[in-house]
Amino acid sequence: FPLLKPTTVIDLGSGRGVWMDEWRKGGAEDVLAVDGDYVDRAQLAVAPEQFMAADLTQPVKTGRRFDLAQSLEVGEHLPTEASEVLVDSLTRASDRVLFSAAVTGQGGEFHVNEQPLSFWQDIFAAKGYVAYDCVRPALKDNKDIAPWYRYNAILYVNEAGRAGLPKEILATQVPAGQKLRNAGSLGWRLRLAVVKTLPRGVVTAIAQARAMVLALRARRAKTLGRAAV
């Protein structure tokens, strides 16, 4: 998100660190990717010293602060009782937090904690962080970006983090008492309505099948690319 221009960024639930690599390419000088010990170090998109193994259901403490903390589509994979722990870890790391998590009915593999946006908004508010709905309007029509990022991403900022925010972001502050609502196209909203009626096992099976298809397509494209060379 170019308006923020952070120089230090931490990502909780980073996977291989792909987002951190993108922030680095965008000008961030110091990044830290944090995820479980299961992440294959040989597949990291960042340097090994830029990765930290941690259990996200437990407090993550790095002993330092960052210009920006982020967690994108991670909260839905953690038990509901770990929701406040995740937010605690994020707010401990920065005055500004870029956050998204799957909403109710989104569906996905290993989703155990899909919640309305207001669920997370309330947890951040208890920590003194206000929602700024600056990301969704900027991305909503960009179909090159996955819908869960376009429709779920919210910037949370505390009083200290307000200092230096561009006026374009300040103008998007969600008024006190106003709950965040789902965004998205008609098709996306219909998907949410349908999926939330399905048993979790069915949703997981669909998500796994879709992941297999996408993986096969990716491998096929890679093979064709090599053949062309």
Please report, for each region that a protein language model flagged, where it lies by residue.
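Hydrophobic alpha-helical packing residues
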Residues: 23-24, 124, 129
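Conserved S-adenosyl-L-methionine
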Residues: 129-140
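Core SAM-dependent methyltransferase catalytic element
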Residues: 143-177
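Membrane-proximal basic amphipathic "stem/tether" segments
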Residues: 171-229
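Conserved SAM-binding loop
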Residues: 1-110, 114-119, 158
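A short, terminal or domain-edge coil/loop segment
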Residues: 86-88, 149-162, 186-203
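Nucleic-acid endo/exonuclease domains
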Residues: 1, 140-143
